[in-house]
Amino acid sequence: MTTASPSQVRQNYHQDSEAAINRQINLELYASYVYLSMSYYFDRDDVALKNFAKYFLHQSHEEREHAEKLMKLQNQRGGRIFLQDIKKPDRDDWENGLNAMECALHLEKSVNQSLLELHKLATDKNDPHLCDFIETHYLNEQVKSIKELGDHVTNLRKMGTPESGMAEYLFDKHTLGNSDSES
């Protein structure tokens, strides 16, 4: 392995921030991988909830885009990207829509916490560029995503899932099926 040459563009970019960005890239790719697993679980012929599948596939693409945005930032700031192995999802069988939404909510809260810690690090290292980047591209979107998932969990519970397969089907058809026209 060759050592990376020093960057000409690096300025006020602490090594701790560079390392934290690489960890965040890994976490975003992990989240994308989890959502991809969820998507294709709901696409199975014995589950057949196509709008859950579409919803989680969209989430997977968003998380991958977040990772790519961080990679672009790393290069712009003169940092070096060091990719790590992406952990496989904790499960392959997501059981039902409520369980998957609860797992997704927990995942988004974890990603948000990591971003908040990255923002604190950037503040501590006096890096206004990184603070602005995180605020502009991530924090508000995370809060919206957490709220949306929380609403989905609440509605699925109120409808009586997972005991009621009909409720899950109706949520898939009417809530997730209508989200395309609202976006």
Curated annotation (Swiss-Prot):
Keywords: Acetylation, Cytoplasm, Cytoplasmic vesicle, Iron, Iron storage, Lysosome, Metal-binding, Oxidoreductase, Phosphoprotein. The modification N-acetylthreonine is found at residue 2. It catalyses: 4 Fe(2+) + O2 + 4 H(+) = 4 Fe(3+) + 2 H2O. GO terms for biological process: intracellular iron ion homeostasis; iron ion transport; negative regulation of ferroptosis. Fe cation 1 binds at residues 28, 63, 66. Its EC number is 1.16.3.1. It is found in: Cytoplasm; Lysosome; Cytoplasmic vesicle, Autophagosome. It is an enzyme of class 1 (oxidoreductase). It comes from the Eukaryota. Belongs to the ferritin family. Stores iron in a soluble, non-toxic, readily available form. Important for iron homeostasis. Has ferroxidase activity. Iron is taken up in the ferrous form and deposited as ferric hydroxides after oxidation. Also plays a role in delivery of iron to cells. Mediates iron uptake in capsule cells of the developing kidney. Delivery to lysosomes is mediated by the cargo receptor NCOA4 for autophagic degradation and release of iron. This is Ferritin heavy chain. It comes from Felis catus (Cat). The gene is FTH1.
